[in-house]
Amino acid sequence: FVLGPHVNVYSRPALAEHARLGAVRWVAPLELPLDAIARINPPEQPVCTSHNVPLVTEVFGFGRLPLAFSARCFTARHFHLPKDECGFRCLEQPDGLLLSTTEGEPFLALNGIQTQSAAQHCLIGEAQALRAAGVRRVRLSPCSLRF
């Protein structure tokens, strides 16, 4: 299985335990810096899966950062519709509903049940640093513009 970025893995022993249970790939938590990722699953001595294969490290590399999930659909709520009778109004808002600060600065985007960053995260120029940290996969999240 793939260990997603919302599973709180912040240490090598925790990652090794998930690998023992069958994880083959780890998507690092969004807030972890590359040096921490490299310490948890170093490229020169990676955690191995239950089949003695190096566990693959992946990071979120492009798009709005998924910050939180809710049982409520914010898009349906915005349009005063019940969640189960929304008619997929989210399709009309491909990048979600932008929330701004009181100063008018973009803050968050509400996209269905997800709260996302308003700004797009982009690691395109960081290929060398990613490789040095042992990252072998980059997760991309599409958006309607500039992708």
Positions of PLM-derived features:
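Active-site pocket-lining/capping segments in soluble small-molecule metabolic enzymes
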Residues: 1-13, 17, 21, 27-147
